[in-house]
From Swiss-Prot:
It comes from Arabidopsis thaliana. PANTHER family: OLIGOPEPTIDE TRANSPORTER-RELATED. The modification Phosphothreonine is found at T103. This is Protein NRT1/ PTR FAMILY 5.14. The lineage of its organism: Eukaryota, Viridiplantae, Streptophyta, Embryophyta, Tracheophyta. The chain crosses the membrane at residues 35-55, 78-98, 104-124, 133-153, 183-203, 209-229, 320-340, 357-377, 401-421, 443-463, 479-499, 526-546. One of its GO terms (cellular component) is membrane. It is found in: Membrane.
Length: 557
């Protein structure tokens, strides 16, 4: 029976966290929003730095570095894909060896070093066109070395900072659990604001003033973010397991697979129970239950796994089908930086007399949509939904993800209709064979698809972050957030593969390719309809899988 003094201690201290001295973390002076705001500020600076170099990277490659458009696009896609997939490795290092806090410090230093070298490479490019081949080779090596150093720094920074921020809220406390759900909303709003600022300010400086200055500003922001992060160390909550347990979580869970596979070959008569608790979760798969057993001729407990380890292994396996279905969102999501922008190039971009908006700048409307809708979702939608569903977060994370997939399907339908309208405009005015001509159709026609994609992000991307964070074992939460990032990376690669196959099947520029270089003869509308179908099929698959999904219990996390 729990005594009054024990209850008082539970209310005063966080069970699974310690402070910077390794002592039990007090609720009153560690964690929660006070600590989370420091960490959110760090992420805003990091996203500002990342998009400060990434959003206009193709212009630098085709400009100062003199690459062709095709080579530059390939280099951008390769860097973007690797930068999105590397966080899985960074999260592994954090969860298995270093812990989140130390991984953030080390990766931030690598990040700053990469940005510093990137600034140096831009500064060394001569203003004249007389560049020797040896100088050109050196500058290219320095630039790409710097660029991939940034990707390595981002790989440890991206998943760990968000996981560390969410760690500041105790999910065993009902109020803090609700605050943690809000944290994911405000986290995404804040980083979107940082991205918007980078697109509007840094890109302008790079184009109008200096590339070295344009790369230097993100470097300064990353230095500031590192100082900010370290300054808050006294109020952070740190994982208790990282301080007290020596067993690598991957070793524990890997052992479950090994023992279960080994025992699978034995008959039931050769096995005896070792540790099968009376309250074992019914959702455990029979395959993993074999890890709780030991051969009769073995010493007591020699090969048995703990029940908690089996639950952790089962939780990871259950995530795989959900991860695959989120690709139905990731593939359409990859289009906004490519074909949405290409559509805008052909349209009337005049916003004021004598003032034209760059097509890529329309991406800012995704951020604007997020910034506007997150407060509405968090302060209006969630309280109303909570009254109806009785869920602390309004709706479950899977329902939130599914809603976003539906919105992305609608986005592709709208994009297809707008593209059909654009092609009809080209036909009506006899501009089909004049790809350089500006069509008498305002670029503002593209705004709805950007705004709707931002709205879909609020549901699906934020939902994915919260879902994968909460459904993995406590020690592997950096891996959980890396899973969400990896889905976007794989979706981008699948999109590239799909485009290549369709282009090959439809004859390329010499035939009637959907992606003809002359966009007025292309059929992006067909492609958008295809993506709408893929997204719709993915949604129904997601619906089927999510209905049978059993959420991981929180009481033992």
């Amino acid at each position: 029976m729990t005594t009054t003094s024990e209850i008082s201690l539970q209310e005063e201290y966080v069970t699974d966290a310690v402070d910077h001295r390794g002592l039990a973390a007090r609720r009153s002076n560690t964690g929660r929003w006070r600590a989370a705001l420091f960490i959110i500020g760090v992420e805003v600076a990091e996203r500002f730095a990342y998009y400060g170099i990434g959003s206009n990277l193709i212009s630098y490659l085709t400009g100062p570095l003199g690459e062709s458009t095709a080579v530059a696009a390939a280099n951008v896609n390769a860097w973007s894909g690797i930068a999105t997939l590397l966080p899985v490795l960074g999260a592994f290092v954090a969860d298995a060896f270093l812990g989140r806090y130390r991984t953030i410090i080390i990766s931030s230093l690598i990040y700053v070093l990469g940005l510093a070298f990137l600034t140096l490479s831009a500064f060394l490019i001569p203003n004249t066109t007389e560049v020797t081949s040896s100088t050109s080779s050196f500058l290219n090596v320095l630039f790409f070395f710097s660029l991939y150093l940034v990707a390595i720094g981002q790989s440890g920074h991206k998943p760990c900072v968000q996981a560390f921020g969410a760690d500041q809220f105790d999910e065993k406390d009902s109020q803090e659990k609700s605050d943690r759900s809000s944290f994911f909303n405000w986290w995404y709003l804040s980083l979107s604001a940082g991205i918007c600022f980078a697109i509007l300010v840094v890109v302008y400086i790079q184009e109008e003033f200096s590339w070295a200055f344009g790369f230097g500003i993100p470097c300064v922001f990353m230095v500031i973010s590192l100082v900010l992060f370290v300054s808050g160390r006294r109020i952070y909550r740190y994982s208790k397991r990282r301080h007290e347990e020596e067993i690598n979580p991957f070793t524990r869970i890997g052992r479950v697979f090994f023992v279960a596979l080994k025992n699978q070959r034995l008959s039931s008569s050769d096995l005896c129970k070792v540790e099968l608790e009376a309250n074992t979760s019914p959702e455990k798969q029979s395959f993993f239950n074999k890890a709780l057993l030991v051969p009769n001729d073995s010493s007591q407990g020699e090969n048995a796994s703990k029940s908690s380890d089996v639950e952790d292994a089962t939780a990871l396996i259950r995530l795989i089908p959900v991860w695959f279905t989120t690709l139905a969102y990731a593939i359409p999501y990859a289009q906004y930086m490519t074909f949405f922008t290409k559509q805008g190039v052909t349209m009337d971009r005049t916003i004021l007399p004598g003032v034209k908006i760059p097509p890529a700048s329309l991406q800012v409307f995704i951020g604007i949509s997020i910034v506007l809708f997150v407060p509405i979702y968090d302060r209006v939608f969630v309280p109303i939904a909570r009254l109806i569903t009785k869920e602390p977060c309004g709706i479950t994370t899977l329902k939130r993800i599914g809603t976003g997939i539906v919105l992305s399907t609608i986005t592709m339908v709208i994009a297809a209709l707008v593209e059909f309208k654009r092609l009809e405009t080209a036909k009506e005015h006899g501009l089909i064979d004049q790809p350089e001509a500006t069509l008498p159709m305002s670029i503002w026609w593209l705004i709805p698809q950007y705004l709707l994609l931002g709205l879909a992000d609020v549901y699906t991307l934020v939902g994915m972050q919260e879902f994968f964070y909460s459904q993995v074992p406590t020690e592997l939460r950096s891996i959980g957030l890396a899973l969400y990032l990896s889905a976007l990376g794989v979706g981008s690669l699948l999109s590239s593969l799909l485009i290549s196959l369709i282009d090959l099947a439809t004859g390329g520029d010499a035939g009637n390719s959907w992606f003809n270089s002359n966009l007025n003869r292309a059929h992006l509308d067909y492609f958008y309809w295809l993506l709408a179908i893929v997204s719709a099929v993915g949604f129904f698959t997601f619906l089927f899988i999510s209905k049978s999904y059993i959420y991981r219990r929180v009481d033992r996390v």
